[in-house]
Amino acid sequence: MAKTSLDFKGMFCPMPIIKLSMAIRKGVSGDVFEVVCDDPGFEPDIAAWCNETGNILNGITKSGKDITATITKK
């Protein structure tokens, strides 16, 4: 199980989800991805994307404008 950190600050919908999709395809089941984004729409987008793809949204934290999501690949 690998852990990958992705910084998508400065990107807006749909780019963070597209970039995450590309990165997660290269992983294997159980890999963890920590994504930081400052797009206010990222929180509902990542929740919907995980729901649609079956990947696991482990949690979301906020610090200032930054939103950090931790996702485990299915």
PLM-predicted stretches and their roles:
Residues A47-K74:
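C-terminal structural segments of small proteins and small subunits
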Residues C13:
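Short cysteine clusters
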Residues A2-K9, E34:
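Short amphipathic
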Residues K3, V32, G64-T68:
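A generic structural signal for beta-strand entry/edge sites
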